[in-house]
């Protein structure tokens, strides 16, 4: 008799995805982040569900309802901080996952890569809308500034912004619709993640060497289930250290002040995981130019596969590309730092230089290094 996990229509899908899945025998810990992102998503949906039971999406009571969750709801404080810091963990895993994809050439799976970019955009939209919900000062002004960027679109810009706001400023209608979207988008992310996995399993996983691993595969369970559980334990450890010891470390103190449309905070800035894109936006003096640069800073990932000039897939045996990759990482850290600084000298200049460096490395230097390394192989 056939094993039920191989014959049952539903269990068979799980079996082919997580148990009997043929996996390269040499994938490193950098391949853990996919499963960690899945765990983060489930954690965010669960904590978010419990928060939504007590939250009210009304400008008059939103701030009070979040305070009520922290003070009066059983374990409300831990649910709230797990949700807020869980988002930070989500983005740490996301950046690591995308970075691994770029380093090891996983972008050569075009469908998987493009759905990944779509997932990144959707997650960023979800996180932005979630940041507006507590209705603190930074929530309100962040929503005002970021939605206002759409007014840079010629001809339809102003009408589009007012349509999104549901009025002439960020108001009750805006908060209500942001809550509705923030609730539904994680489920769309879940569906996209399933499609992402579907396309990945069509081709099989990449591996650090970048070479085909058809001759050397091992079953996913128990080898990689155990390995993923180790990664999961470390993730939970980091998350709980944040939640229990310094829950407000990554937040903004201004968000503990209720939203006041008549009082602008001295420095309006988004959450830390958007600072690199915010720095690129601010580095261009023109409004439309800044918005385009902001979108392109993420959309540039879509052209990475087209700019691959090397005969090798990953960067494991490509020292020049490795140097450029880590320079790009350092540059992104610099942009993150600049995004949180006031708009004054020398930060403006540093931001502009870091933005130029960011686009130059990806669009110009990486393809050139690939060509140089191809020639070095002939020597």
Swiss-Prot record:
User: Which positions bind heme b b566?
Assistant: 97, 196
SUPFAM superfamilies reported in the protein's UniProt record:
a domain/subunit of cytochrome bc1 complex (Ubiquinol-cytochrome c reductase), Transmembrane di-heme cytochromes
InterPro entries (UniProt xref): Cyt_b/b6_C, Cyt_b/b6_C_sf, Cyt_b/b6_N, Cytb/b6-like_sf, Cytochrome_b, Cytochrome_b_C_euk/bac, Cytochrome_b_N_euk/bac, Di-haem_cyt_TM
Give this protein's Gene Ontology molecular function annotations: metal ion binding; ubiquinol-cytochrome-c reductase activity
Where, in this chain's numbering, is a ubiquinone bound?
Answer: 201
- Gene3D superfamilies attached to this UniProt entry: Cytochrome Bc1 Complex, Chain C
Keywords (alphabetical) are: Electron transport, Heme, Iron, Membrane, Metal-binding, Mitochondrion, Mitochondrion inner membrane, Respiratory chain, Transmembrane, Transmembrane helix, Transport, Ubiquinone
Any single GO CC term annotated in Swiss-Prot or TrEMBL for this entry: mitochondrial inner membrane
Q: Per UniProt, what is the membrane topology?
A: Multi-pass membrane protein
Question: Source organism's superkingdom?
Answer: Eukaryota
Q: State where the protein is found.
A: Mitochondrion inner membrane
| A Gene Ontology biological process term | mitochondrial electron transport, ubiquinol to cytochrome c
Co-factor binding details: Binds 2 heme b groups non-covalently.
Q: Pfam families attached here? A: Cytochrom_B_C, Cytochrome_B
Q: Name the residues that bind heme b b562.
A: 83, 182
Question: Where are its TM segments located?
Answer: 33-53, 77-98, 113-133, 178-198, 226-246, 288-308, 320-340, 347-367
Cofactor(s) required for function per UniProt:
heme b
PROSITE patterns, per the entry: CYTB_CTER (PS51003), CYTB_NTER (PS51002)
This molecule's function is given as:
Component of the ubiquinol-cytochrome c reductase complex (complex III or cytochrome b-c1 complex) that is part of the mitochondrial respiratory chain. The b-c1 complex mediates electron transfer from ubiquinol to cytochrome c. Contributes to the generation of a proton gradient across the mitochondrial membrane that is then used for ATP synthesis.
What subunit structure does UniProt give? Answer: The cytochrome bc1 complex contains 11 subunits: 3 respiratory subunits (MT-CYB, CYC1 and UQCRFS1), 2 core proteins (UQCRC1 and UQCRC2) and 6 low-molecular weight proteins (UQCRH/QCR6, UQCRB/QCR7, UQCRQ/QCR8, UQCR10/QCR9, UQCR11/QCR10 and a cleavage product of UQCRFS1). This cytochrome bc1 complex then forms a dimer.
Q: Which PANTHER family match?
A: CYTOCHROME B
Which family does the UniProt entry place this protein in?
Belongs to the cytochrome b family.
Q: What else is known?
A: Heme 1 (or BL or b562) is low-potential and absorbs at about 562 nm, and heme 2 (or BH or b566) is high-potential and absorbs at about 566 nm.
What is this protein's name? Answer: Cytochrome b
Whose protein is this, by species? Hyaena brunnea (Brown hyena)
Gene (name only): MT-CYB
């Amino acid at each position: 008799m056939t094993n039920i996990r191989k014959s049952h229509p539903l269990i068979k899908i799980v079996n082919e995805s997580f148990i009997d899945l043929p996996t390269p025998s040499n994938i490193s810990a950098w391949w853990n982040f996919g499963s960690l992102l899945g765990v983060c998503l489930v954690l965010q949906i669960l904590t978010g569900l419990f928060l939504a039971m007590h939250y009210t999406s009304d400008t008059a009571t939103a701030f009070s309802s979040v305070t009520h969750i922290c003070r009066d709801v059983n374990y409300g404080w831990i649910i709230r901080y797990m949700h807020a810091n869980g988002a930070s963990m989500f983005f740490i895993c996301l950046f690591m996952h995308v970075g691994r994809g770029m380093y090891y050439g996983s972008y050569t799976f075009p469908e998987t890569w493009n759905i990944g970019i779509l997932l990144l955009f959707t997650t960023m939209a979800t996180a932005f809308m979630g940041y507006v919900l507590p209705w603190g000062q930074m929530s309100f002004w962040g929503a005002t500034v970021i939605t206002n960027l759409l007014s840079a679109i010629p001809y339809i810009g102003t009408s589009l912004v007012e349509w999104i706001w549901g009025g002439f400023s960020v108001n009750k209608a805006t908060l209500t619709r942001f809550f509705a979207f923030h609730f539904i988008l994680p489920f769309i992310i879940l569906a996209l993640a399933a499609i992402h996995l579907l396309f990945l399993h069509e081709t099989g996983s990449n591996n650090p060497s970048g070479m085909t691993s058809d001759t050397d595969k091992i079953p996913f369970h128990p080898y990689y289930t155990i390995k993923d559980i180790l990664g999961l334990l470390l993730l939970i450890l980091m998350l709980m250290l944040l939640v229990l010891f310094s829950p407000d470390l990554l937040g903004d103190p201004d968000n503990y002040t209720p939203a006041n449309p008549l009082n602008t905070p001295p420095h309006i800035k988004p959450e830390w995981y958007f600072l690199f894109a915010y720095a690129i936006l601010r580095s261009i003096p023109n409004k439309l130019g800044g918005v385009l640069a902001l979108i392109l800073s993420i959309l540039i990932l879509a052209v990475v596969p087209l700019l691959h000039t090397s005969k090798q897939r990953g960067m494991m045996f490509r020292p020049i590309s490795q140097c450029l990759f880590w320079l790009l990482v350092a540059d992104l850290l610099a942009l993150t730092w600049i995004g949180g600084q006031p708009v004054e000298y020398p930060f403006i200049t540093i931001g502009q230089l870091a933005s130029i460096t960011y686009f130059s490395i990806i669009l110009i230097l990486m393809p050139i290094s690939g060509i140089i390394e191809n020639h070095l192989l002939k020597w």
